[in-house]
């Protein structure tokens, strides 16, 4: 929870500057097209803040000088569905004992899977219902965003550090992409894009 709140705080600090940089070309495009929609603008701002929160959560806190000096090599977990083996090995679940079901559901391995899915739910929802992308494009963009995150973790924040300080995991890639698609699958008919209001 502390890490989550710290990530939101960091995103809040960075948001005004990045929003200002994005706003200039955005508003210029709207003026040239002679159309403007405050709803899309608000959703766009919320989406930008959400993306900053995700990036802060997956890349921060950075290792300190002592930790960075000990980093070497780049760690990657390439076994698909390793989280299933982790669940069976680490949780207290005993199928014959119903008392272990609830503790197993709140085990770290389960929460990690759930959080990886939830992390990109807003991402896919924005692409599908605000941008109007079809399911295939939502899947590709969600996969690309997740791959960007995992590549950053594999390379030590794109070679800023000598080694990985977070694990690059193929399961995270799959679960993030699933999260990006999940809400889009609930309503498979073509979504109505937020209309442009002319002025």
Predicted regions and their residues:
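Bulky hydrophobic segments
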Residues: 1-165, 184-185, 189, 193
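Amphipathic alpha-helical recognition patches that constitute DNA-binding helices
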Residues: 169
């Amino acid at each position: 929870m502390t890490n989550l709140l710290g990530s939101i705080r960091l995103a809040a600090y960075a948001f005004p500057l990045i929003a200002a940089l994005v706003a200039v070309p955005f508003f210029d495009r709207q003026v040239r097209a002679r159309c403007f929609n405050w709803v899309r603008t608000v959703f766009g701002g919320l989406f930008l803040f959400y993306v900053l929160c995700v990036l802060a959560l997956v890349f921060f806190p950075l290792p300190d000088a002592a930790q960075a000096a000990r980093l070497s090599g780049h760690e990657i977990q390439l076994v698909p569905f390793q989280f299933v083996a982790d669940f069976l090995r680490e949780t207290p679940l005993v199928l014959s004992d119903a008392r272990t079901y609830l503790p197993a559901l709140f085990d770290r391995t389960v929460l990690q899977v759930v959080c990886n899915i939830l992390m990109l739910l807003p991402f896919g929802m924005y692409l599908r219902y605000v941008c109007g992308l079809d399911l295939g494009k939502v899947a590709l963009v969600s996969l690309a965003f997740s791959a960007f995150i995992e590549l950053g973790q594999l390379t030590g924040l794109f070679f800023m550090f000598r080694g990985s300080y977070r694990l690059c995991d193929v399961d995270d890639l799959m679960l993030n992409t699933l999260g990006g698609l999940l809400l889009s699958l609930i309503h498979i008919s073509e979504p109505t894009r937020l209309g442009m209001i002319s002025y």
